[in-house]
Design a protein with these regions (language model features):
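Short beta-alpha junctions and helix-cap segments that line functional grooves
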Residues: 46, 71-74, 169, 173-177, ...
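Conserved nucleotide-binding/hydrolysis micro-motifs of P-loop NTPases
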Residues: 63-67, 75, 89-93, 134-136, ...
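Walker A/P-loop NTP-binding active-site region of P-loop NTPases
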Residues: 18-83, 87, 257-319
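Conserved inter-motif catalytic segment of the P-loop NTP-binding fold
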Residues: 55-138, 294-372
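Short glycine-/polar-rich loops that comprise or flank the Walker A/P-loop
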Residues: 26, 53-56, 81, 161-162, ...
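Flexible loop/N-cap segments at domain edges
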Residues: 249, 255-275, 280-282, 326-333, ...
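P-loop NTPase motor core
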Residues: 29, 101-182, 186, 337-421, ...
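Conserved P-loop NTPase
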Residues: 1-2, 6, 114, 123, ...
Length: 481
């Protein structure tokens, strides 16, 4: 249990959510990370928000010039009006010229700490950023000396009405722990290079003395004029109990095959080879949901918006493509430019901001490429399915494969945690390739076990009769039931 403490918003709402309200007022916090992770950008965002609310803000730079800092702000389209920017040289030129090879580090470091404290006291700032502690560390003769000076600085700052953010570079020798233990809060920024596509950025709160926070890694992105943080999903924190709706396909034979309408909050996986009709079946459910007045979120990793909408016109009704009520929310996702956290955040926004009752992911194979390096597909998807279930949102996940369902391999492994499975296949009969469909699983009820013909016509989807040819003439033998 944590005592009531006053929080200071960072200017990044989602980061404040991770921090359970923001930084702790009148405390010293550390933002650390390797060069290029966005420490300066985050520090500027913190001060800009303070200045916008009328607070006195101070940026103390020990490494960059004022002009360089202003250029960084301009690159994001930001103005530093209302923010005092002061340069403090760790070693003044007149002092440096008088030094011998034996530097009196005790005097220099103590003087630097004193100058920092004096500048903050003089400004009367309520928000302070000090960039960067690397310059301070370089003046320390050893770790104990550095730690003593940091504690001295922290004690001096405690006399002021200021919430201070220190910026520091992570080092290979592990010396960042010296600073971590001396401050009240620590946020670590990390940038991971991928074999192809954009680098992935993520952050975590290491500690927040006296305050609660959401632990774990959270993806973030730096855009031209803002920083976006995507808090990791905790399904149990979300629930929506109103307006429970099952999802019918509006195709009687398809509903009968899968055992009725898809239950509200259930997850369904549609699997099959390329071109077998997976997306078309999913779009049929989307069309039915839109016609019933529900909002639908459709996330496409593979096909363009124009291709999907033309397919809706070709196989379904024109009304679905025009969608005058704007209930069909189609988003094209580039798997090489998005992080797992950002994708889940997009799903949440469709559900929470638009009130979507059906979410379709097409297809999961491309999403696998986004998170393959984490080796946590089942954990992340299970959390997403749990969240959607708690929000009474029905989900459909499309997975492409060319062989029999194999739950030991991706993406078929997802079938273990989904509630329903619809399988599509090709089969050859009398030198003609046909499409087949069957239901393999329904967790909350019974379903048909017949393999039936699937037709994609100008009028829409049609489910034919049970396929009566011998099994060895069908290219989809050994269906699981």
């Amino acid at each position: 249990m944590h005592l009531d403490i006053e929080r200071i918003p960072t200017g990044i709402p989602e980061l404040d959510a991770v921090l359970r309200g923001g930084l702790i007022r009148q405390r010293v916090h550390l933002i650390e990370g390797r060069p290029g992770t966005g420490k300066t950008t985050l520090g500027l965002r913190y001060l800009i928000h303070g200045a916008s609310t009328g607070q006195r803000c101070l940026y103390l730079t020990l490494s960059e010039s004022r002009e360089e800092l202003l250029a960084t702000a301009r690159s994001h389209g930001w103005s530093l009006d209302g923010i005092a920017v002061e340069e403090i040289m760790p070693l003044p030129p007149e002092t440096a010229s008088a030094q011998t090879i034996l530097l009196p580090t005790d005097t220099e470091l103590s003087a630097l700490v004193g100058r920092i404290a004096d500048q903050i006291a003089k400004s009367g700032a309520e928000r302070v950023v000090i960039d960067s502690m690397v310059e301070v560390r370089l003046l320390a003769r050893d770790s104990p000396h550095y730690r003593r000076q940091i504690i001295d600085l922290r004690q001096r700052l405690a006399r002021f009405d200021a919430t201070v953010v220190l910026l520091d570079d992570l080092t290979a020798d592990g010396r960042e722990y010296e600073l971590q233990s001396a401050v009240h809060g620590v946020v670590t920024l990390e940038q991971l290079e991928r074999s192809f596509g954009a680098a992935r950025r993520r952050l975590r709160v290491v500690k927040l003395r006296g305050g609660d926070f959401q632990s774990g890694w959270h993806d973030y992105a730096i855009q031209k004029n803002e920083i976006l943080v995507f808090p990791s999903l905790i399904a149990q924190e979300h629930r929506r109990d109103d307006d429970v709706r099952d999802m019918s396909s509006n195709v009687e034979s398809l509903d009968r095959l899968v055992g009725g309408a898809l239950s509200a909050g259930s997850s369904t996986m549609i699997v099959g080879p390329s071109g077998s009709g997976k997306s078309t079946v999913a779009l049929q459910y989307a069309l039915a949901a839109v016609e019933s007045g529900c909002h639908v979120g459709y996330f496409s990793f593979d096909e363009s918006e124009s291709t999907l909408r033309s397919r809706m016109v070709e196989h379904m009704h024109q009304d679905a493509a025009t969608d005058e009520q704007r209930r069909f929310h189609l988003q094209r996702i580039n798997p090489s430019r998005i992080s797992p956290g950002e994708f889940i955040w997009k799903v949440r926004r469709i559900v929470e901001d638009r009130g979507a009752r059906l979410v379709i992911i097409d297809c999961i194979n491309s999403y696998l490429d986004v998170i393959r390096e984490e080796k946590s597909l089942l954990l992340q998807m299970n959390e997403l399915f749990s969240y959607l279930s708690n929000m009474n949102v029905t989900s459909i996940i499309i997975g492409a494969h060319s062989a029999r369902l194999d739950t030991s391999k991706e993406p078929d492994a997802l079938s273990i945690i989904t509630d329903n499975i619809i399988s599509l296949r090709y089969y050859e009969h009398e030198n003609v390739v046909h499409k087949a469909i069957c239901a393999l699983k329904r967790r909350d009820g019974r379903h048909e076990h017949d393999v039936r013909e699937l037709y994609l016509t100008d009028a829409g989807i049609e489910i034919g009769e049970r396929i009566a040819v011998p099994v060895d003439e069908i290219g989809v033998a050994n269906f699981d039931s």
